[in-house]
Amino acid sequence: MAGPTLLKESGPREVFCGLTSIVWLHRRMPDAFFLVVGSRTCAHLIQSAAGVMIFAEPRFGTAILSERDLAGLADAHDELDRVCKELLQRRPEIRTLFLVGSCPSEVIKLDLARAAERLNEELSGQVRVVNYSGSGIETTFTQGEDGALAALVPLLPASDERQLLLVGTLADAVEDRQMHLFQRMGIETIRSLPPRQSTDLPAVGAGTTVLLTQPFLTETARLLGDRGARVLTAPFPLGAEGSRRWMEAAADAFHLPDERVAAVLDPLVERAQSALARHRAVLEGKRIFLLPESQLELPLARFLHRECGMQLVEVGTPYLNREQMAAELDLLPDDVPVMEGQHVEQQLDRVRASQPDLVVCGMGLANPLEAEGIATKWSIELVFSPIHGIDQAGDLAELFSRPLRRRQLIRPGLHPSSLDPTVHA
C-alpha cells in the first residue's frame, strides 16, 4: 500500500525540555502554581520563555537544587516541604500545586510522587498537590503538557454522562469558538481538559468521547481510554481541511445529521479558502523541510501540502504514534520521507543538500541556517500561536508565507551563492 516512507534515526538532538509547557499551562489555569524542582538553568529557561518581569508575581517558580542537594549532603525532601509550605502561606489563592520534575531532580532520584503524597496528607485537602516530569531526558518540550494532563486524569470524577471532552490547551477564544460550533451542530455537553480552573475537573467515563486538540498527548489519551472514554482518531484541527475532518469525527460519533453539520461548516470553509488564497500564491510550489521538535510536524505538513501547495522534502517528528497519527499519515503524499527521531548533524546535512525554500526548526538552528541563506520558521512559535480551527487557517498560512516574503525583501533569491561560507550549528 502506497503512503509516506516511515524512517527512524537517533543521535544528538536539538529541542527544548518539557518545562517550556509551563508557559502556556500556567496561563490556562490561573488558580494553579507550577513549582519546578531543578537548577538555576531551569529557572532561567522558564523566566526567559514566559517573559515575566522579575518583580511580578507569576504562577510558577523554581525550587533550586543546590550543590549540597546534588551531592547528597542535605535532605532535599525536608527542604522541598519547607519551600512548598512557605509558598502556600504566601500565596493562599493557590488551589493546585504542581511539583514539576527536571533533569537534575531525576538524576538525584528525588521522589516527587512521594513528596506530593506527603504534602496532600498534611494539607488535608486545602490544596491539591500533584507531580509530573518536565525533564528533557528522552522527551521533547510539548510532552510537558502530556505529563501534566496525565497527572490529572486519576483525579477526574467518574460519570457516564454523554459528553464531548476536548483534550489539550487551546487559546481561550479559539476553544470558545470550537465549543460554540459543536453546540450549533447539536452536541450539548462539551468539557475541556485542562480546565480553566484547576479545581473544575471534568468527569470521565463510558459516556465520554475524547477529541484530542494536540498530537502530543499520547499518555493522556491512553489513561482516558483506561477510564472508559472513547478516544477518536482524526486529523488534527490545523487548516480548514484538518479542522473540518476533526469536527466531523465528533459529529459522526454523536450521530449528527450530515445536513446540519454541513450547514455549520460549509460557510466557514469557504471563508477559510478565500483567506488562504493570497498565501497560497506565495507558498505554492515552494519546498519545505520540517525538522523534529514539537510533534505538530505531521499535521503541519499535511496542511502545507494539501491546502498551500508546498512540496515536502522531509517531515521530521520527535516521536510517532502510528495509531494516533494514522489519519494524518493517510493524507500525506506517497513516498514523502517521515523521519522519527533526530540526528541533528545528519538532518542538517540533508537540509544543505536539498536546499529547501523554507525550514521549520528550533530556535537554536534558525540563525545558522539563515546565515547560510535558507529561510526558517521557529517551530516553537507555532505552539504559542492561536492556529487551531477553520477560522485560523489563513493566519496559520501567513506564519509560513511571512518568512518567504521577508527574504524576498531582504535580498533577491532564497538560496546562498556558492561563495557563502558554511555556518555549522
Curated annotation (Swiss-Prot):
The keyword Transmembrane does not apply. Gene3D superfamilies: Nitrogenase molybdenum iron protein domain (3.40.50.1980). The keyword Nucleotidyltransferase does not apply. It is an enzyme of class 1 (oxidoreductase). Binds 1 [4Fe-4S] cluster per heterodimer. The cluster is bound at the heterodimer interface by residues from both subunits. GO terms for molecular function: 4 iron, 4 sulfur cluster binding; ATP binding; metal ion binding; oxidoreductase activity, acting on iron-sulfur proteins as donors; oxidoreductase activity, acting on the CH-CH group of donors, iron-sulfur protein as acceptor. InterPro entries: LIPOR_BchN/ChlN, Nase/OxRdtase_comp1, Protochl_reductN. It holds the Pfam family Oxidored_nitro. [4Fe-4S] cluster binds at C17, C42, C103. SUPFAM superfamilies: Helical backbone' metal receptor. GO terms for biological process: light-independent chlorophyll biosynthetic process; photosynthesis, dark reaction. Pathway: Porphyrin-containing compound metabolism; chlorophyll biosynthesis (light-independent). Protochlorophyllide reductase is composed of three subunits; ChlL, ChlN and ChlB. Forms a heterotetramer of two ChlB and two ChlN subunits. Component of the dark-operative protochlorophyllide reductase (DPOR) that uses Mg-ATP and reduced ferredoxin to reduce ring D of protochlorophyllide (Pchlide) to form chlorophyllide a (Chlide). This reaction is light-independent. The NB-protein (ChlN-ChlB) is the catalytic component of the complex. Belongs to the BchN/ChlN family. This is Light-independent protochlorophyllide reductase subunit N. The gene is chlN.
